[in-house]
From Swiss-Prot:
Taxonomic placement: Eukaryota, Metazoa, Ecdysozoa, Arthropoda, Hexapoda
GO-annotated biological processes: cell redox homeostasis; determination of adult lifespan; embryo development ending in birth or egg hatching; larval salivary gland morphogenesis; response to redox state; salivary gland boundary specification
Function: May be involved in a redox-related process. Required for survival and specifically for salivary gland morphogenesis.
Biological source species: Drosophila melanogaster (Fruit fly)
Biased composition (Basic and acidic residues): 8-19, 175-198
Cross-link Cysteinyl-selenocysteine (Cys-Sec), sequence positions: 34-37
Record's protein name: Selenoprotein BthD
Length: 249
């Protein structure tokens, strides 16, 4: 029998040809596509070229970066790049779509709009971080310039406060004097009114006393001497007994 021939080692499919030398500062389009049909890979390459023609010339392509793909998969994700380690943002999932097979592939417009939105948000975040850094760098110089201005302003404020405080003290004294004067006038007026009331009440009381004395004198003159009470004579018990004995005799 002829000796058995050893099987030739199958050459690995070059899935990462397009992504051998990736620029970390440029965005990357990751595509996981099924190997059972060549249509999946062709669609991925056509999508990448169409996006570059639309204006995304820095967009890079990476096919099946995680190894063996899933059956019927056509998964798209984007890494914006330029900020160190970037998380992949999912753009499309063909496993959740189909049959028919045509539903597994997105249109160029849908993918383009999503990528532009993600890159625009990243650009805004970069600008914000740059402005914050520049403001932090400028802070020490601005503080040094602002500190003498603050000291000068505080000195001026203190100087302005000194005359204002004296003027306010004078005003307060004047107000106190003006308040005390009307109170004194009011107290004098109250005393005078009380004295007038007393003087008015005294002649009235004297008149009443004179009238009362005159009425008492008139009553005493009008009473006759016969009006005095006469003492009533009462008989004693001994007189009654003697009178009764005389009658019997």
């Amino acid at each position: 029998m002829p000796p058995k021939r050893n099987k030739k080692a199958e050459a690995p499919i070059a899935e990462r040809d397009a992504g051998e030398e990736l620029d970390p500062n440029a965005p990357v389009l990751y595509v996981e596509h099924c190997r059972s049909u060549r249509v999946f890979r062709r669609r991925a390459e056509e999508l990448h070229s169409a996006l570059r023609e639309r204006g995304l010339q820095q967009l890079q392509l990476q096919l099946n970066a995680l190894g063996a793909p899933r059956r019927g998969a056509f998964e798209l994700s984007l890494s914006a790049g330029g900020m160190g380690k970037q998380e992949q943002v999912a753009l499309w999932s063909g496993l959740k779509r189909g049959p028919p097979r045509a539903r597994k592939f997105p249109t160029v417009e849908e993918v383009y709009d999503q990528i532009v939105g993600i890159l625009g948000d990243q650009q805004e975040s970069k600008e914000q971080t740059n402005t914050q850094k520049s403001s932090k760098i400028d802070l020490p110089g601005s503080e040094a310039i602002a500190s003498p201005k603050k000291s000068e302003s505080t000195e001026e404020a203190q100087e302005n406060k000194a005359p204002t405080s004296t003027s306010t003290s004078r005003k307060s004294k004047k107000e106190q004097k003006s308040e005390e004067e009307p109170t004194q006038v009011d107290s004098k007026e109250a005393k005078q009114s009380k004295e007038l009331v007393k003087t008015k009440r005294q002649p009235k009381a004297q008149k009443k006393q004179a009238k009362a004395s005159e009425s008492q004198e008139e009553v005493a003159e009008d009473k006759p001497p016969s009006s005095q009470k006469r003492k009533r004579t009462t008989r004693s018990s001994t007189d009654e007994a003697t009178a009764g004995a005389k009658r019997r005799r």
